[in-house]
Amino acid sequence: MGGREVGGLANMLASHREIVNPIHRLEMEEFWGGSIISDKIGLTATEMFKGLEEGKLKAIWIVCTNPMVSLPDARMAELAMKNAKFVVVQEVSNRADTIKFADVVLPAATWAEKEGTMTNAERRITHLSKVIDAPAQALPDAEIICRFAAKMGWGNKFEYNNFGEIYKEYTETTRGTNIDVTGVSYQLLKERSIQWPAPAALPAPDGGAKNSFSDSDNFTFDEIEKAPPSGAGRGWT
């Protein structure tokens, strides 16, 4: 869930905005104050690895996943990484299948070694507390990305003193959207979990909206014709 809210899909921007929607792109361009956002949808995970296999994509940075396990075709993933010109693996374990293909390994902290938030399938946002320190040079994924951005000359866009500031920026991107959580502070999440939406105009003393889209008016699908699956009547039950 949480990855979709922050725009972690190839066709999305923050807070359920769509890359192909010019209004959505303009909103994020103005919010970030940076360059023009391309209207081209990015590659999905399977498309990226297919691109590596075919030589259309040269490099890949793998974060928070093991494609040898998560992708449907593990053999294709292996061939793709063998064919890649440059592979960066950001991992919590030195035993991951992807390590042997890496040109650069970035040691990442595990869930118990970092803090942040997660969103589950009922739209419930929960604060995750750090339990122990990460070993050696391992860092939280967000900190690795911020440090990389600074090396690339974008440090002024990634100047966060703590993870609460990152969360605060995210909440501002949700303002006025169907997942508005401007009424949910980082401190509040440390006290209890909250279900979105929970906008600042409608504080969530009892934990946010239990039922989303309950007005039966907004964000609903149009009625569609019901039809049997292809092949019905030939062995379908």
For each of these PLM feature ranges, what is it?
Residues 1-180:
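Non-catalytic alpha/beta scaffold blocks inside enzyme catalytic domains
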Residues 4-9, 165-237:
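Long, low-complexity segments enriched in small/aliphatic residues
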